[in-house]
From Swiss-Prot:
One of its GO terms (cellular component) is ribonucleoprotein complex. PANTHER family: 39S RIBOSOMAL PROTEIN L20. One of its GO terms (molecular function) is structural constituent of ribosome. It holds the Pfam family Ribosomal_L20. Binds directly to 23S ribosomal RNA and is necessary for the in vitro assembly process of the 50S ribosomal subunit. It is not involved in the protein synthesizing functions of that subunit. Keywords: Ribonucleoprotein, Ribosomal protein, RNA-binding, rRNA-binding. It comes from Blochmanniella floridana. The lineage of its organism: Bacteria, Pseudomonadati, Pseudomonadota, Gammaproteobacteria, Enterobacterales. InterPro entries: Ribosomal_bL20, RIBOSOMAL_L20_CS, Ribosomal_protein_bL20_C. GO terms for biological process: ribosomal large subunit assembly; translation. This is Large ribosomal subunit protein bL20. Belongs to the bacterial ribosomal protein bL20 family. HAMAP family: Ribosomal_bL20. Transmembrane segments: none annotated. CDD domains: Ribosomal_L20.
Length: 118
């Protein structure tokens, strides 16, 4: 019976893990066992934060829209409600971009909404 040795496989697997852990502090970048745990945890954080990123950006867009809408005498919820009532379908990302970078277009949008809401 031939004896199976895993030293080459184990060494390459350890090297792969340690390569992914470069830049980590202390033993996390030098010791396989600690580096493996750090990489697993980093992956969990990355997965969680990819989901949170979408929520955070939506909150940011809404706060930008609300801040500019209040300058023109509308609250955020009135603005969105009247947009849908007047059949203007624009997502919050584009609306926030209009509100921050192109004030004239946003003002035209608000005036259009005010006309249709009466």
């Amino acid at each position: 019976m031939v004896r199976v040795k895993n030293s080459v496989t184990a060494h390459s697997r350890h090297k792969k893990i340690l390569k992914r852990a470069t830049g980590y502090y202390g033993a996390r970048s030098r010791t396989y066992r600690v580096a493996y745990q750090a990489i697993i945890k980093a992956g969990q954080y990355a997965y969680r934060d990819r989901k949170q990123k979408k929520r955070i950006f939506r909150q940011l867009w809404i706060s930008h829209i609300n801040a500019v809408a209040r300058q023109y005498g509308l609250s955020y919820n009135n603005l969105i409600n009247n947009l849908y009532k007047s059949s203007i379908y624009i997502n919050r990302k584009m609306l926030a971009e209009l509100a921050t970078s192109d004030q004239v277009a946003f003002l035209n949008l608000v005036n259009n909404i005010k006309i249709h809401s009466k």
